[in-house]
A protein has these predicted regions:
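Short small-residue beta-strand/loop micro-motif enriched in glycine and branched aliphatics
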Residues: 36-37, 131-137, 232-233
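Acidic/His- and Gly-rich active-site-bordering loop/insert found
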Residues: 1-38, 57-63, 247
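Flexible glycine/proline-rich, aromatic-decorated loop/lid segments
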Residues: 112-128
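Short beta-strand/turn micro-motifs at beta-sheet edges
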Residues: 111-115, 232-237
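Acidic-enriched catalytic cores of C-N bond-cleaving enzymes acting on peptides and small amides
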Residues: 106, 115, 122, 136-226, ...
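A short beta-alpha structural unit
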Residues: 250-251, 279-290
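Short, solvent-exposed beta-strand/turn "edge" segments of beta-rich domains on protein surfaces
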Residues: 142-143, 233-241
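Acidic/histidine-rich catalytic neighborhood of metal-dependent amide-processing enzymes
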Residues: 41-116
């Protein structure tokens, strides 16, 4: 009999900001027919679904194959131990099919088979100016403000057409054929429902591509977090000494996450003004797969 290996993960993204939760994140509740709690969607819920499906097929004598489960606890931080584990446990993990229990559906009523996932390059940048915070009344307009500089640098990474501006970023991207694009856009995706579910007025992204193409087969760049200066209640008129951001780039076949990290660092340093110092760090990455 064939063997299926089911991969999933039980670790989750951080729960902050806590004040936006209506229930405790790690105390799941059923509301409106749905389970609410951290990991209900990514990825405890999906893994549980496959485990229960396996259990039901065993109970009814309908299991047509062997099944193995591999659930890890480091997916959200780049699966740092997974590569070593897979190399050391090749015999244990040997299978004919790998089922990734960590994907999505086009809609609530449309079963979907995901046959590819974009890759990732995840970076952190820090822009530093003066050695300490300065008073904006005394130094504003004369000293580079790291927060202002960072905002300009980050904004320049994607142009008005939604394209990443890093030189060489698209060099290895495999372009889809007209037939592949037609096949992709035959999927029962409803843009109006998509916008409604996200509570947005309109979509955005790379010009010339549909939302399905933008999220599935085109690379992208996003700021995941940005911080610096005074953000508490009240006022504090400073020029912050430093400002930082976390930036992720989603990659498509033929793009190498290590190469993209080097291109990003080289470009970010090149566009930074001499009035500030820049630190660029690669956090983690993963290869795209189709």
């Amino acid at each position: 009999a064939k063997t299926v290996l089911v991969y999933g993960h039980y670790d989750v993204m951080p729960v902050d900001p806590l004040d936006e939760w209506t229930t405790e994140p790690f105390e799941p509740v059923v509301r409106d027919g749905r389970i609410w709690g951290r990991g209900a969607d990514d990825d405890k819920g999906q893994s549980f679904m496959h485990i229960k499906a396996f259990e039901a097929m065993c109970a009814t004598g309908q299991l047509p194959c062997n099944v193995k489960f591999m659930l890890e606890g480091e997916e959200e931080i780049g699966s740092q131990s997974l590569y070593k584990f897979c190399r050391e446990q090749k015999r244990l993990l040997k299978s004919d099919v790998i089922l990734v229990s960590d994907t999505s559906m086009i809609s609530m009523d449309t079963p979907s088979i995901t046959c590819g996932l974009r890759g990732l390059t995840y970076m952190q940048v820090e822009v530093t100016g003066p050695e300490k915070d300065l008073h904006s009344g005394l130094f504003g307009g004369a000293v580079a403000n790291p927060a202002n500089v960072l905002a300009r640098l980050v904004a320049s990474l994607v142009d008005d057409e939604g394209r990443v501006t890093i030189p060489g970023f698209y060099d290895d991207v495999r372009e889809l054929s007209a037939a592949e694009r037609r096949a992709l856009n035959k999927a029962p995706f409803r843009l109006a429902d998509y916008k409604r579910s996200l509570h947005i007025g309109d979509v955005a992204g790379e010009a010339g591509y549909t939302t399905m193409e933008r999220t599935g087969v085109r690379p992208s760049l996003d700021v995941n977090g940005i911080w610096g200066g005074y953000i508490e209640e009240g006022t504090k008129t400073i020029i912050p000494a430093r400002a930082s951001a976390k930036i992720s780039m989603r990659l498509v076949p033929n793009q190498d996450f290590r190469k993209i990290a080097k291109l990003f660092e080289r470009y970010f340093r090149a566009i930074a003004p001499r009035s500030v110092k820049v630190d660029v760090r690669f956090l983690h990455g993963g290869a795209p797969y189709v």
